[in-house]
Amino acid sequence: MTKTVEMVITGAQVLNVYTREFEATSLWIDHGRIISNLRDEPYIAAQHVDATGQWIVPGMIDAHVHMESSMVAPSELGKVLLQHGVTTIATDPHELANVAGIAGIQYLIDDARQTPLDVCFMLPSSVPCVPFDDNGATLHAADLRPLYQQSEVRGLAEVMDYGAVARGDTDTLAKISDAYAYGYHADGHAAGLNAHQLNVMRNAGLDTDHECMTVAEAQDRVRAGMAVFLREGTVERDVLPTIGAVTEANASRFAFCTDDKMISDLLTEGSIDYNVRLAMQSGMRPELAYTLASLNGAMAHRLSDRGSLSAGQLADLVVLDDLEHVRIARTMKRGQWILPSTTKPLPFTATRVQHHAQLADFQLPLATGLANVIGVQPNHIETDHLTLPIDATQNFEADCQRDILKMVVIERHHNTGKVGVGLVHGFALKQGAIAGTVAHDAHNIVAVGTSDAAILRAVAQITQDNGGIAVVDNEQVLATMPLAIGGLLSAASYQKVAEQLAELKRAYEVISERPLSFDPFITLSFLTLPVIPTLKLTARGLFDYATFDFIPVAIQDNQRQTV
């Protein structure tokens, strides 16, 4: 008896990721899976789709992403990613986990169930990212274990605390071993590590890295046996500087990720489809670029049921009108064409922004003529450690002519009263201030401005909103975006969030000296992350990654660099 199947797609050029070639063949689909990729089969298809003149590639996979960086809830993010051909993501929910602990992770899992997008949760390994950061929760191995009972959980996310790994911290190693005990794996985070340090990470069981910024770094990690995720986010623009590390011989060790990408950039550029476009623009063959975007991400995360268009695989696929420009006609997820969705984010009420910061807390006396200053690196999350001449003063506020501004970090989770104050170069403000509750990874309040009063006004606005981002011109609020979900995510639609981000950027142009080549809001959010080089500010003060210790703002040393 002839078997009836749900669908056959004919006429297209179909990518075989195993041979890295396009084939003129058919795809037979039934019950959410591909049952054959042969042109002729003795099946009767209930639906026939003619894709003549088009290309079909596997659904794309984002191998490492923090959903919270989009600033929309998972159910909203899924709507956008599926439009861009992304059918699976491996996400590290450590942003909301740092704010709300297990409740934050569970919220993301629950809300993600509203989208057809497959969201594979890698449990956060470093909450807090370092013991001396003031976040909202602490998660030990024992806290994470019950989450492995949920099918969405697929391993351990990036282990960022190299020091804990190197000294054999019991809880850190338990988190890693738990991931393997449940049949999964553990992601690494090897920013700035040398070959010897990479071996320490590998011996602990960490088998991926997404922090490469150069060809040499990527090659070192491949030689060490790690899978490398080439990253293109809002700030982390690393695909073009690293794509030269990929060869036909080692290509299976590379996949693509976005890490941190705002919804506005996802809408204008794309997600992994943008990484593919960049790779091909740099000279990579389309067959290879689309393989990095699909099969390789699946292999890195041990997702054996996806990543190719072969029998037995999930029917996750992308139909393209234009191969080299990645022009997507439509996306299929588990055998169903993606259609517009009307779902709305689930409510979240687990946290409140709480602090009692006042103007006096922003005082920064400088008794000497030199200061340690954070230097912004445009479109990178690393910073420069600048040593700049500063006039002695009882309270430094801003030197707009030299683009040296005051920056503050206010603990917002437990109302401890901790406030870190430092200096930053690179934001080009001429007046006003900006503030936000997105501040990796502890997500305290972070602000930068030209006066203490402007900083306090911006802080007051986001406190009133129970989290968000604000731009003020002295006392006037020019734009604000409430982030009701833990101070990280908006409860609004992705379209509304994109509009609000555009308003924030327009407001920033009003108070800035010149147009910036980078996003000031997400850039500011990374100036508080102590596990990324070089100089960062936390609620406890200025932190030097090179010495892995806190340092004063005012110094006596010889001048290192001037502006």
Curated annotation (Swiss-Prot):
Its EC number is 3.5.4.2. One of its GO terms (molecular function) is adenine deaminase activity. NCBIfam families: ade. InterPro entries: Adenine_deam, Adenine_deam_C, Amidohydro-rel, Metal-dep_hydrolase_composite, Metal_Hydrolase. The gene is ade. The lineage of its organism: Bacteria, Bacillati, Bacillota, Bacilli, Lactobacillales. Keywords: Hydrolase, Manganese. Belongs to the metallo-dependent hydrolases superfamily. Adenine deaminase family. It is an enzyme of class 3 (hydrolase). This is Adenine deaminase.
